[in-house]
Each structure stands twice: as C-alpha cells, then as structure tokens.
C-alpha cells in the first residue's frame, strides 16, 4: 500500500482508544475489486468485542457531553482539517478497496469531510425554547440533550461519507458512537479512526469494530446501552434491524434502498438532461442508492435523447481507478455483476433492446460495460428492483399523468429527478413525486447542507442539514413552578 502516511493503513480495529485484534485472532480478508488481489485483513470481531466498545462509549459519554459545544466543534474541525490534509492518501485507499476512480474518491473525501465541518458548527446551534406558561406562576423551558450511546452500520459504496454523515452529528450533539463498517471497505473507516485519534477525540467516543455483520450488528441492536442505531443499506436489512431495535425501543435512522425515476419531458434541455443522466446513472458505476434506476423519456424527444446518451456513454473510460483518465471502475463483486446480467436478460426477454454495452467488459473480473436498454416494458424487473449497476433502462411515456403514476408505482421513495423548462410543470411534478428528494434539472443532489433521506420503504430520518443533528437529540420539557 503506497501512501504518503503509511500509518493511515490500519489492519486492526479501534476500540476504546486502542488498536486491537479479535479475541480469537480470526481475520477477514479484503480484496481490490479491480484486480482481485488481497489487500490485507482486518479482525473478525464478534459480540464480546462489540460489547466492550459499547461499554467504553458509555464510560466516555459523561465527559464528552459535558464539553461545551465550542469544545466539541473544535475537535470536529480538527478532524475535518486532517481529512483535507490527507485527502490524497484517503482517496487512494478508497480506490484500492472500493474500486471507484481516484477523482471520484477525492471528491468523496471532500464530501465526507464537509459533514464534520458542518456539524461542528451546528453543535453551537442546538437551541431550546421558552414557552409562555399555562399558569401565572409557571415557566416552561425546552432543552435538547444528547440521546446517548449510538451505533452506526455503514455500506461499502461510500465508505467515508456514510461514516462522517453519521459520526459528525452524533459527536456534535454530545453522543458517543460505535461504528460497524462494511467488511468490503474497512480501511477507509479505520483511517478515519486514526485521524479522529490525532484530532483529539477522546478514547471511547468513537470506536470502529470490524467483523461478523450478524454478531456485531446483533450486539449493537440488542444491547440496552445503545439508545440509537443509524444504518445505511438495503431495505431488507433495514427492516430486520428496525425489528431488533424495537425490543428496547431504540431510536432508529434508516437510509435504505431506492428506485429513482429520471424523467425527461419534451421541453427539457436535452444536453443538460444527458449530462445529468450520465452523472446520476453512472457515477460510482451505478452503485449509489440515489442513482437513476428508471429513465422515463417523453415520446417527442425519446430517440434524440437516446442518441445523445449513447454518444456520452461511449466516451466513458473503463478500468482500474488508479489509472489516469479512467472514469468508471469495477463493480464491487461477482454478485453485483450477476444482478446486472439478470436485469438485462429479463428486460430483453420481454422485448427490450440493448443499444449499448450489455455484457461483462473485456477487462474481465467484475468490470461491466455501461449499458443502455430501449423500449423497456413496464413489467420488466428493473422497473421494480434496484439494479445497483451501470444499466440505464429507457422507458417511453406519453404525458405527465402517466409518468407520475409510473414513477410513484414503487415501494421506494428516496431520490427522483426530472428535466423540464415549464415553471408550472416544475412545481406540479415536484410536489406530486412521492420521494424525499427531487432533483430538478440536475442529476447531482447530495451535499452537507441539505436534508438527505427518503420516505416509504426508503427509510426514516434525515442526514445532513440543520435537521440532521435532531436525530441525535432528545427534547426535555422543564416546568418551573412557584415563580
């Protein structure tokens, strides 16, 4: 691992301020999806080690929450500064373990760091209220306090940003956190722990436990010390975690699956729409929860849009993310490849046509050609199921009512996108789409200042923005009598 700072490549878990192995010495191997090579290994921890991390978080909680907001903010700011100072190393580490191109990885590091900066400042803006009393001698005050020990389970597709988007508000609010990162991408998480330690985050405040998803996750959901769980991942696992957390009424934040529609109306700027589709669909090789999963294009511009999209996709450069000029890396594993192939085969069997890509890339491994399907029928599997890969199925629609009905015909409600110029239509469609987020004439909507989250089966709660810190706070009502 060639890094400027070799200490950022950690192969031990970080628990209670110490770098430790699993009790039984077992490890999990981590591979580079672009080459298949083994990068290294991390501890395969279980319930016992997780319990110790939780107990350490509980022990660290009183002192951490007692700090002033400014003191916590200063430590988060230092963590942010260290991420920016080490952006190149962190990005390289991410590309090696996750596969995304280096330019995308650098962008993610900047995005990830922004949550530490933002929520460090928000720590100073945790405001309460005074409410007129219900009797002459009564005074009512509302204060907000940290919920306590929190747990986070994060995915492999954004292995840094999904951590800071949770740890930032948790620590800013005065909570402590135990993190279980994805086993495919643990090194990004461990590098962040190294920088947190350098930033002066006290021991026990932020721990990273690597290992068995079932055992670690089971302890996080069943341990009564943990008062909140935050999870980004599939709806299936989210349902399971929510049920487990219900046993002792834990607070939960869930950012789950998506099935984003990307709508292009007749009056759209087609060049802008193609640019937006390229970003929304093929960024991170389609492995994002907010990527366009269904492209709906109105009859009048259907053929022109497809031609422009084909030309844009043809310019994508597939390869190892560390190589110069590469725009698209590999899929994370063979299972991801199989799902893309399944969706293509199903659509083609029902009448769709492949006009670009459609098969594994000549590079082999988990590389896959960016694919476009046309004349996709409404009953295709891809219309209901999130692909999580470089497949753009282009559906036709006739009018606004039809496309809104098709777009909303899903259990998911995370992100949606549409391109149109008519101002009345912009507001009409935006308000009728049943999604937590709507991108209008843009294919890139994620940032630290906006509330990220979904409705329906896409989750609960919001991350980022001034609302993101609220999920880590409890409201307490004080009634003063005899005044």
UniProtKB/Swiss-Prot annotation:
Q: Which CDD domains match?
A: ALDH_F5_SSADH_GabD
Identify the residues that bind NADP(+): 156-157, 180-183, 233-234, 256, 386
Q: What reaction is this protein's catalytic activity?
A: 5-oxopentanoate + NADP(+) + H2O = glutarate + NADPH + 2 H(+)
- What keyword terms does UniProt attach to this protein? NADP, Oxidoreductase
The molecular function terms of the Gene Ontology recorded here are: glutarate-semialdehyde dehydrogenase (NADP+) activity; succinate-semialdehyde dehydrogenase (NAD+) activity
Q: Which processes are annotated in GO (biological process)?
A: gamma-aminobutyric acid catabolic process; L-lysine catabolic process
Q: Which InterPro entries match?
A: Ald_DH/histidinol_DH, Ald_DH_C, Ald_DH_CS_CYS, Ald_DH_CS_GLU, Ald_DH_N, Aldehyde_DH_dom, Aldehyde_DH_Superfamily, Succ_semiAld_DH
The pathway to which it is assigned is: Amino-acid degradation
Question: What GO cellular-component annotations does this UniProt entry give?
Answer: cytosol
Family, as annotated: Belongs to the aldehyde dehydrogenase family.
Protein's recorded name = Glutarate-semialdehyde dehydrogenase
């Amino acid at each position: 691992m060639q890094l400027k700072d070799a200490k950022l490549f950690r192969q031990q878990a970080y628990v209670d301020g110490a770098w430790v192995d699993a009790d039984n010495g077992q490890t999990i191997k981590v591979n580079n999806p672009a080459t298949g090579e083994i990068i290294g290994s991390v501890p395969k921890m279980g319930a016992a080690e997780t319990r110790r991390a939780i107990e350490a978080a509980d022990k660290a909680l009183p002192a951490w929450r007692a700090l002033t907001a400014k003191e916590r903010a200063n430590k988060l700011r230092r963590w942010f500064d260290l991420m920016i100072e080490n952006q190149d190393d962190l990005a390289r580490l991410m590309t090696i373990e996750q596969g995304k191109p280096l330019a995308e990885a650098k962008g993610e590091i900047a995005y990830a760091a922004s949550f530490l900066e933002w929520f460090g400042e928000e720590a100073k803006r945790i405001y309460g209220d005074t409410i007129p009393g219900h009797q002459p001698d009564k005074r009512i005050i509302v204060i907000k306090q940290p919920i306590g020990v929190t747990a986070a389970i994060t995915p492999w597709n954004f292995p840094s940003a999904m951590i800071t988007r949770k740890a930032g508000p948790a620590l800013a609010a005065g909570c402590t956190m135990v993190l279980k990162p994805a086993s495919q991408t643990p090194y990004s998480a461990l590098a962040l722990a190294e920088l947190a330690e350098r930033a002066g985050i006290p021991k026990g405040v932020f721990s990273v436990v690597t290992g068995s998803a079932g055992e670690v996750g089971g302890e996080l959901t069943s341990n009564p010390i943990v008062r909140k769980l935050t999870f980004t991942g599939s709806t299936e696992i989210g349902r399971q975690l929510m049920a487990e957390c219900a046993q002792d009424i834990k607070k939960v934040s869930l950012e789950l699956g998506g099935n984003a529609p990307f709508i292009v109306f007749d009056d759209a700027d087609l060049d802008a729409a193609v640019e937006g589709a390229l970003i929304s669909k093929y960024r991170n090789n389609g492995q994002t929860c907010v990527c366009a999963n269904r492209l709906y294009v109105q009859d009048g511009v259907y053929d022109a849009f497809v031609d422009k999209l084909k030309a844009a996709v043809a310019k994508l450069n597939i390869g190892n993310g560390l190589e110069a000029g590469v725009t698209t890396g590999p899929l994370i594993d063979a299972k991801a490849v199989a799902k893309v192939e399944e969706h293509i085969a199903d659509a083609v069997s029902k009448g769709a046509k492949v006009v670009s890509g459609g098969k594994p890339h000549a590079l082999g491994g988990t590389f896959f050609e960016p694919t476009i399907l046309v004349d996709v029928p409404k009953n295709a599997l891809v219309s209901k199921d999130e692909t999580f890969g470089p497949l753009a199925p282009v559906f036709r629609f006739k009018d606004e009512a039809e496309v809104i009905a098709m777009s909303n015909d899903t259990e998911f409600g995370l992100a949606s996108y549409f391109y149109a110029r008519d101002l009345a239509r912009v507001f009409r469609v935006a308000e009728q789409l049943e999604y937590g987020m709507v991108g209008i004439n843009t294919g890139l909507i994620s940032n630290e200042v906006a509330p990220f989250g979904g409705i329906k089966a896409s989750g609960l709660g919001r991350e980022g923005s001034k609302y993101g810190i609220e999920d880590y706070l409890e409201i307490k009502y004080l009634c003063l009598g005899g005044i």
